[in-house]
Amino acid sequence: MNRPERLQPGVKLRDADKVARIPVKVVPSERETMLRKPDWLRVKLPSSNQRILEIKAALRKNGLHSVCEEASCPNLAECFNHGTATFMILGAICTRRCPFCDVAHGRPLKADADEPKKLAQTIKDMKLKYVVITSVDRDDLRDGGAQHFADCIREIRLLNPEIKIETLVPDFRGRIDAALDILATEPPDVFNHNLETAPAHYRKARPGANYQWSLDLLKRFKERHPTIPTKSGLMMGLGETNEEIAEVLRDLRAHNVEMLTLGQYLQPSKFHLPVERYVPPAEFDELKALADELGFTHAACGPLVRSSYHADLQAQGKEVK
């Protein structure tokens, strides 16, 4: 048997190369078998792309990344046009191979020690009042990247004292307590970690992750910081049932999670997991009603909702669909 080729630092693997060695093999989708996208998922493009170009230029100038671009988010045009972006720190190469995600896999480069200062200056230049900071998984780092998160939060607040910061963190696999110790030095205003799907679908959708670990991460952060809102997000359309999603909502509340996002999974390419169904808006409304009944302080549920979509409005408790 031939040994797998050693990954070269900084080389991005995408599509078939990315998912080649995951436990549940993804069969490339044929065009004729792919579900037709319904009208409710059509995204309206802004009349002008000037603001979009400005934000992209600001990111390129400082060598920064946005998850909006790296993960091919359908809301990129709307968010960029409104002057908001979700910044992705620690590079654009992930150590995991999740087959629903369009972020590249590979062997990441060393973290950029200047990134926290560059990020803070970019946010100041863009005059942002609310930012979301996320990252790729960095299983190659002893602390999973927690110190880099803390450094970014500190530098952002030094230059932008009035800003609100939401972190969308990885699962810090095997190092939760160490990561939370570090984050306690610079806690965010909102702590977000996505469960993504129901536990029965983790093996195919989140290889390398663990449902209970993710719940424990959210719960342990809340135990340390009872006044800081915790948040999680889920996708629909990966083969789960509505009852499975309902059970996840109950688990989240049992672990003291207060904010929820629930949206439709969209297949980035034919090499990613297929969309098994497009969930009608009425079903999102039903799950929103359940979330309210369970006691979530805010639940954004709709086909185009993403974990950082209008995150500032979500944090204010305003309706987002």
Swiss-Prot record:
Keywords: 4Fe-4S, Cytoplasm, Iron, Iron-sulfur, Metal-binding, S-adenosyl-L-methionine, Transferase. It is found in: Cytoplasm. It comes from the Bacteria. GO terms for molecular function: 4 iron, 4 sulfur cluster binding; lipoate synthase activity; metal ion binding. It catalyses: [[Fe-S] cluster scaffold protein carrying a second [4Fe-4S](2+) cluster] + N(6)-octanoyl-L-lysyl-[protein] + 2 oxidized [2Fe-2S]-[ferredoxin] + 2 S-adenosyl-L-methionine + 4 H(+) = [[Fe-S] cluster scaffold protein] + N(6)-[(R)-dihydrolipoyl]-L-lysyl-[protein] + 4 Fe(3+) + 2 hydrogen sulfide + 2 5'-deoxyadenosine + 2 L-methionine + 2 reduced [2Fe-2S]-[ferredoxin]. GO terms for cellular component: cytoplasm. Its main location: cytoplasm. It is an enzyme of class 2 (transferase). [4Fe-4S] cluster 1 binds at residues 68, 73, 79, 308. Its EC number is 2.8.1.8. Pfam families: Radical_SAM. The keyword Iron applies. Binds 2 [4Fe-4S] clusters per subunit. One cluster is coordinated with 3 cysteines and an exchangeable S-adenosyl-L-methionine. Pathway: Protein modification; protein lipoylation via endogenous pathway; protein N(6)-(lipoyl)lysine from octanoyl-[acyl-carrier-protein]: step 2/2. [4Fe-4S] cluster 2 binds at residues 94, 98, 101. Its cofactor is [4Fe-4S] cluster. Residues 80-297 form the Radical SAM core domain. The keyword Cytoplasm applies. NCBIfam families: lipA (TIGR00510), PRK05481.1 (NF004019), PRK12928.1 (NF009544). Belongs to the radical SAM superfamily. Lipoyl synthase family. This is Lipoyl synthase. The gene is lipA.
